[in-house]
Amino acid sequence: MTNPFDSAGSKAPPKPFTVSEGRREVRSFVLRQGRFTPAQQRAFDERWPRFGLDYTGQPRDLDATFGRPAHKVLEIGFGNGAALRFAAQHDPSRDYIGIEVHAPGVGRLLNALADDNADHVRLYHHDAVEVLQNEIADGALDEVRIYFPDPWHKKRHNKRRLLQPAFAELLVRKLRPGGRLHCATDWEDYAEQMWDVLDATAGLVNRAGPRGSVPRPDWRPQTHFETRGQKLGHGVWDLLYDRT
């Protein structure tokens, strides 16, 4: 097991989370680790062997990983882990995989999963594109959730947004027919881009119709990102797509 942060505090940061732009790769996030508390460090030391998935670059048998056949739900960029923990608590019949590059959020969720005895959850602390490309088999996922990705609201930074055509096509490959993609954002401009990209992606059908959104589903709790956005006067858009 390769500990992302050993107990001495030496870092082994993940590679940049990237989206394609022509021949070069554009980072879709800026890595800000923030304060790493002693409790979060202990989480990596003690909890990672139970709940963590080390990146190997090889296809992974998810049924073997979880020890059962069950619907597989992937959340990309789970932040502090509130939505992923909520889902795991309220529907333990599913298996959940979370990907997050910011170590404090991973450490926090590791501790919460131990408190919940949530052995139907596994976490990656790695580049989501690499995980999807190399470790998740085509058609292996029943659902992908992407909640409040970085909006990169300055126009010159829009190319850094995660939801780009190449990434959408990658998601389609990893979802089984009949699967589901659920995205949420509190930036109207990003919702517009999501519609531009996802409505035009072969293999995805907007459940609410072209450029449509749905009320917040019961399986997504109101997150601190959403609360913050509403305080700033932002709307919230939930986009739900079926994989054909």
UniProtKB/Swiss-Prot annotation:
Interaction with RNA: annotated segments: 156-161
Keyword vocabulary terms for this entry: Methyltransferase, S-adenosyl-L-methionine, Transferase, tRNA processing
Region (Disordered) residue spans: 1-20
SUPFAM superfamilies linked to this entry: S-adenosyl-L-methionine-dependent methyltransferases
UniProt KW Methyltransferase keyword: yes
Family: Belongs to the class I-like SAM-binding methyltransferase superfamily. TrmB family.
Protein name as catalogued: tRNA (guanine-N(7)-)-methyltransferase
Entry's Gene Ontology molecular function annotations: tRNA (guanine(46)-N7)-methyltransferase activity
Catalysed reactions, as listed in the record: guanosine(46) in tRNA + S-adenosyl-L-methionine = N(7)-methylguanosine(46) in tRNA + S-adenosyl-L-homocysteine
GO cellular component, one term: tRNA methyltransferase complex
Keyword Transferase: yes
EC number: 2.1.1.33
Function: Catalyzes the formation of N(7)-methylguanine at position 46 (m7G46) in tRNA.
Annotated positions binding S-adenosyl-L-methionine: 75, 100, 127, 150
InterPro entries the record matches: SAM-dependent_MTases_sf, tRNA_(Gua-N-7)_MeTrfase_Trmb, tRNA_methyltr_TrmB_bact
Domain of life according to the entry: Bacteria
Pathway(s) it belongs to: tRNA modification; N(7)-methylguanine-tRNA biosynthesis
Species annotation: Stenotrophomonas maltophilia (strain K279a)
Catalytic site positions: 150
Binding site for substrate: 154, 186, 223-226
